[in-house]
Amino acid sequence: MSLKKISLENFTVFSKMEIDFCDGINVFIGENGTGKTHIIKLLYAACQAAQSKKTGIDFQTKIVKVFRPDEFSLLRLSKRGVGASNSSVKVFSNKSNLVLSFHSKFKKNVETTGSEKWEKEFAELTSTFIPAKEILSHSRNLVQAINAGNVDFDDTYKDIISAASVNVSRGPDNERKTKYLRRLQTITQGRVKIENEEFYLLPTGQSQSKLEFQLVAEGLRKIALLWQLIKNGTLEKGSVLFWDEPEANINPQNIPAIVDLLLDLQKDGVQIFIATHDYFLAKYLDARKTKENHILYHALYKSNDSIQHESESDFALLENNSILKQSIDLYKEEVKKVME
């Protein structure tokens, strides 16, 4: 089971868009405002909607919760500047599809189809969205405050706190999990501990000492979050990981280790969706992939007042590659300076 395709019409920045995915790692690149995060949020909402019988939150509601438009109005997510129009979000898997249709002016025209088959196919699916900004250092009572409407965060922040707060996993760590945990612990120099809804880092070899997450560098907190999600069984075979800007606040020297982890998770059956601006992350994925890895790059770009896309399995083959373009421009500037 995996996500295969998304089709959008008159939704946020998109007029018409249809993107096919691979079962492995899908990497979205593009300038700001091209909708990278919008796409992975929609896919996450579709995954979460499969649990609607348990959570009471359907596809339409989850979309509103992850985008948080004014007045929680779905209609505000229609593409602006096109007048009265029909909008739709369609997400396809191997065996089913989930469709949300609505009109930009009429609330009563909202319709969701395909929910029953979708929920049946993905009944056991675990999906996780890691936002660009680290939030675990502010986790104490935050979920309750969000639910009470006292603070304004979209659901991706609340959900990642809930996912990380699961403090146990079934049975002892297997060989695969132990390998991942040791690799990440080499970077963080510690493991995660949860006490009274607070996250701490226990430095390696100092069992009686603990560091509040607020005292740990943000980049290391993000890596510690990965450690916790693997430790508690959230990232397992058959799960889906969405990660917005993995490179944010990460020391560049740790990017290769993150890439190796993502490649191994994919080989172990985790489907991954990433939105990034980082040349090193995108290029390391391309350079270190093996025949066992499946990677598809999706470049989003602006053309004639609309968002277009192209997809390639080879990073260098993308014609509208904003990341590579900036790297080349920088190289030209350096050469010019040397030649002066």
Language-model regions, residue ranges each:
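Pre-Walker A-like glycine/lysine-rich segment at the N-terminus of P-loop NTPase domains
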Residues: 1-44
